[in-house]
Amino acid sequence: RFHNMVSSRKLHIIPRKGEYFLLDKGAGDHVSRTIFALPGKLGKGVLVTPTVHGNLLVGPTAADIEDKEGTNTTASGLAAIYEKAGQNVRDLPLKKVITSFAGLRAHEGGNDFIIEEASDAPGFIDCAGIESPGLTSAPAVGLMVADILRDKMHLQRNPDFQGRRKGILNPALLSIE
């Protein structure tokens, strides 16, 4: 959206909806590792994965939609999750579903990551079309953007930079005291 406001070269971003459901912790031992399906043309396929909290997360679907705010779940989407997950994991306990949700991924029509300075908008760095394995690629994408900015702005390393910080406290693991 922002790219198209500043550049004459237009990107065509398609909202790709992914629906999920989350099972109660009582279902958490149904699988011990992430179970991946074979990926399709729209994404990585439906997976079943234990969460750090002991639940099971199942999804996503992948459907290109028009509505850029369309984060509703649908009966057909949730049924598709169950059917596809059931091909790899038997007897998923649907009675233990505690919530369902959907999110949108920004699919770019060119089917590739776009990480570059917009040619006709100096200083505007695009990071678009980042899909699977986008999460895994995030550190490399960050380094690419840093390199673009370093070269453009002639940045120098700060020898006094402190790259470590204290860890984030998890209140659930703390004692009452």
Residue ranges of predicted features:
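Predominantly flavin-linked oxidoreductase catalytic cores and closely associated redox partners
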Residues: 1-42, 67-68, 72-79
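Residues forming anionic-ligand binding surfaces in small-molecule and nucleic-acid pockets
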Residues: 61
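C-terminal catalytic lobe of FAD-dependent flavoproteins
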Residues: 39, 43-45, 49-53, 64-177
